Regions:
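PRPP-associated nucleotide enzymes
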Residues: 1-174
Length: 174
């Protein structure tokens, strides 16, 4: 049961937020192995050619899954962190804007990509990642998360846009 490895930090990063910390899964080798195995099982009915992980915790689950499934890993980074030619996509945060980037040569036309991250809340970050993959000519096979916070609407937003989503765990609240 992975849920017991998720640490909840009240009032972080601001009052009223219950932060779901998955680093406690990553800190435990058995829990991390189980997380990767469950992720692979969760998506075994879906065909994809590559795994894209969103900066930063999406890199951890994404690279573990990539290793297990013997598929390429594509890092989707915060703006200004990739050394080669990139495209970027902006998205709205609670207090401003941010951007994600991906190398222009990381996805080829028609590549089916599974996008992964640790958690989905409002869906702004992962929606930007979906746009990046599509702009490069890739197809989004789905978006997977360790945790979803359904009350914040991110999963609904993706599903309304026709993107398949799956999560290992679901928590109420913010």
């Amino acid at each position: 049961n992975l849920e017991k490895f998720v640490r909840t930090v009240p009032d972080f990063p601001q009052p009223g937020i219950m932060f779901r910390d998955v680093t406690t899964i990553f800190n435990n080798a058995e829990a991390f192995r189980e997380c990767v195995n469950q992720f692979a099982q969760l998506w075994n009915d879906t065909k994809f050619d590559a795994i894209a992980g969103i900066d930063a915790r999406g890199f951890i689950i994404g690279s573990g899954l990539s290793y297990k499934l013997e598929l390429p890993f594509v890092p989707i980074r915060k703006k200004g962190k990739l050394p080669f030619e990139t495209i970027s996509e902006s998205y709205v945060l609670e207090y401003g804007k941010a951007s994600l980037e991906v190398h222009t040569d990381s996805i080829t036309e028609k590549t089916k990509v599974l996008i992964v991250d640790d958690l989905i809340a409002t869906g702004g970050t992962v929606s930007a990642a979906v746009k990046l993959i599509k702009r490069l000519g890739g197809e989004v096979a789905g978006c997977g998360f360790i945790i979803q916070l359904p009350e914040l609407g991110g999963v609904s937003t993706l599903e309304l846009a026709g993107v398949k989503t799956k999560s290992l765990l679901s928590f109420g609240g913010h």
